Amino acid sequence: MLVWLNGQFVPPDQAVLSVFDAGLQHGVGLFETMAARGGSVFRAQAHVRRLADSARELLLTDRLHVEPLVEAVAQVAARGDLDNARIRLTLTGGNLNLLQSQGADKVDPTILIVAQPATVYPDVYFERGVTMLITDGRQNPFDPMAGHKTLNYWPRIQALQQAASKRAGEALWLTVSNHLASGSVSNVFLVRDETLHTPFARGEEEPGALPSPVLPGITRAAIIATADQMGIETKKHMLDIEDLLGADEVFLTNSSWGVLSVVGVEQKKIGEGTPGEITKRLRAAWLELVEKETSED
């Protein structure tokens, strides 16, 4: 494990945050999880830019500089000396006690980067696919935090725990209007008639439509671009349970899994109940893309 805290590398057992840090006191913060191979990070700039955009939009800070932070992420990954790593970038509102003790009108955010060995999922996970459980919670498009990767993951973790208790690999969230949103830690795609379908993400909505609570995933964007290069069309629109259950294939995307097939939703089988051909092609293409981009650095 390697830790970088506020501009300095520190031993993990000496990495200390103030008890007055906004992330601890109020859950004020954002994070990014990135995949690294051989010391190179996949799409680091896209991840850091998303975090900086969210920080500005949510009034956390407008003083983040993307390029130096991308360089810090790269240094952590390189010095971590891990063939397959998970890089976690965390940004909080900083030490709020300084506002009172120093009379400051702003405080510097806390920036933490940690490199750890990536979780290794068994091959059978991808060969057989997983099932999903529909969570009881709903994503609210009017929540100003919706569609941003904030530190408040408690509802999502709780949903994942509920899914795991039913031997499901992911928990599916719907919106308050009962349209598909996303998994707890993933974006969702449907395949129907050899076309990809995925819910609108934040910033992709049609004019006049409700805001989308869906995170614009970095892997999601990579898969949409890859599919286009393969001649596979992607349609972004509102989807419901009937669309999901009637799909030929369903798969999930995130930085850890890449592409993961969904073969069932609770008791309902998706397609043939096995990973579909388009899903398998896209997973293979994603693995090649990660290998290519992390080998070029």
Predicted stretch roles:
Residues M1-L172, V176-H179, P211, I224-D297:
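Conserved alpha/beta cores of soluble small-molecule-handling proteins
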Residues H179-L210:
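Glycine- and Gly-Pro-enriched alpha-helical subdomains that act as flexible
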Residues I218:
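Active-site microenvironment for binding and transforming phosphate-containing groups
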